[in-house]
């Protein structure tokens, strides 16, 4: 049987909470192609692959969201599969009339606390430690969709080490907008 494609809309508190990296990881696990991006309504996903795998993605978006996310709705619509769709990417955000919410600031998570007090780590005693699971969201956001370019951190370039973490899928700071050093 051939591939199917679904356009999936996720609404709620789904920006600034590690939702795009979460979707990316699920897509890799399920061998799906397509993309995920933030937009003015929440998160927009194109998922293409075996029907069983696409349906598994939709179910898991509802049941396994990141801890800071609050999924209000997951809506899917069938679309035409593309022969040119390969791999799964975090696509650039799309602007529009804002109808989504941003998460609240969250205290430091246990993993970041471990780094904060590790004298051998590069984030030892770093006052602005954060990852996709903790740190500032609301107080640094200047606009939506939520991306680093729409935070108060936008004028500050990432150092080479932080820049290397940002696109690295296995890292807690994968696409974490408030990362800084």
What are these regions (language model features)?
Residues 1-179:
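Intrinsically disordered, low-complexity, mixed-charge
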